[in-house]
Curated annotation (Swiss-Prot):
Mg(2+) 1 binds at residues 270, 284. Gene3D superfamilies: 3.40.50.20, ATP-grasp fold, A domain, ATP-grasp fold, B domain. This is D-alanine--D-alanine ligase. PANTHER family: D-ALANINE--D-ALANINE LIGASE, D-ALANINE--D-ALANINE LIGASE B. ATP binds at residues 147-199. Belongs to the D-alanine--D-alanine ligase family. InterPro entries: ATP-grasp, ATP_grasp_subdomain_1, D-Ala_lig_Van_CS, D_ala_D_ala, Dala_Dala_lig_C, Dala_Dala_lig_N, PreATP-grasp_dom_sf. Pfam families: Dala_Dala_lig_C, Dala_Dala_lig_N. GO terms for biological process: cell wall organization; peptidoglycan biosynthetic process; regulation of cell shape. Pathway: Cell wall biogenesis; peptidoglycan biosynthesis. It comes from Rickettsia peacockii (strain Rustic).
Length: 323
């Protein structure tokens, strides 16, 4: 199991990437979260697209002095390319609301809800979104045996990119009493959809589902961090090979989640399809989907006729702050 940590960084790193342009975009990336490297790689393609679109671009690797840096450079818009803690969890949108700087991606409540697996689950179920059975386990519970019948999934409360996610199968030599809660004192224990469960991903932009793809695992047992970011570990079947009525239902459910959570800009909804019953189980909605070469939202957007540069332009158009 990988152990990724949040690193406290005192000072932001500011780099001018383009000094002329129609508007000044601060491209926020890196930061202090466990997903720092993913964010930095995502920002590379985004920066090229912004410059191609004619924007003045300043890159900011976010540190604790971010408010001071933003006051100094005075951007017209912040493109939030951060993943994980402080960027994806509602913290940065809260600061930008106070500073009245328009920003891309979802706002405070939407981001915070989506990032926290307990609260997003409550929200989903309240809005009649089907999910697999799950329970919350606290470190202080001192549970010695399996908290749920195997197979089950262990999910950290607030991590992205499948960091810290483990699937415990019946044959695994695993003792829950030895689990050390590496990402906080609470975890979600979720039923693993057995057999022919199919991993489905939907890209949503401005409330409209652009399409869906299916993840076919080639090496690892589940869609973990390594599989997500290593070429050759999974195939993407785009569009997802589903009957027309089921494909349409998948898009409608994704739009419902997006709208009930009041998301903004791009998002990626994740589902498991139980093939024996054709039942869809929602996993989560990601309000800060990756923008890397292997990333799903750009791939689905391309299938829908939106190239990467135009996708970034559409995201910029959604920039606003909450008053």
């Amino acid at each position: 199991m990988h152990k990724y940590q949040t690193h406290w960084v005192e000072h932001s790193i500011v780099k001018i990437l383009s000094s002329t342009g129609k508007k000044h975009i601060a491209l926020m990336a890196g930061g202090m979260s466990a997903e720092r490297e993913v964010s930095l790689v995502s920002s590379e393609g985004v920066s090229k697209a912004l410059i191609e679109l004619g924007y003045r671009v300043t890159f900011i690797d976010m540190g604790a002095d971010i408010a001071v840096r933003l006051q100094e450079i005075k951007p017209d818009i912040v493109f939030n390319c951060l993943h994980g803690t402080y960027g994806e969890d509602g913290c940065l949108p809260g600061l930008l609301n106070i500073m009245r700087i328009p920003y891309t991606h979802s706002g405070v409540l939407s981001s915070a809800l989506a990032f926290n697996k307990i609260h997003s689950r409550i929200w989903f179920l309240t809005n009649n979104i089907n999910m697999a059975e799950s329970i919350v386990v606290n470190k202080s519970d001192n549970i010695k045996n399996d908290p749920m019948k195997r197979p089950y999934v262990i999910k950290p409360l607030a991590q992205g990119s499948s960091i810290g996610v483990e699937v415990i199968f019946a044959e695994d030599d695993f003792n829950f009493a030895d689990y050390d809660f590496p990402y906080g004192d609470q975890v979600i224990i979720e039923q693993y959809i057995k057999g022919q469960g199919r991993e489905l991903q939907v890209a949503v932009l401005n409330g409209k589902a652009l399409g869906a793809l299916e993840i076919k695992l080639l090496k690892n047992r589940f869609y973990d961090y390594e599989t997500k970011y290593t070429e050759g570990f999974a195939d993407h079947l785009c569009p997802a090979p589903l009957p027309a009525n089921l494909y349409e239902k998948l898009l409608i459910e994704s739009e419902k989640i997006y709208k009930t959570m009041n998301c903004k800009g791009p998002a990626r909804a994740e589902f498991i399809l139980e093939e024996q019953t054709n039942k869809l189980y929602a996993l989560e909605i990601n309000t800060h989907p990756g923008m890397m070469p292997l990333s799903i939202v750009p791939e689905i957007a391309a299938y829908a006729g939106i190239n990467f540069t135009n996708l970034i332009e559409e995201i910029i158009k959604t920039a606003s702050f909450e008053s």
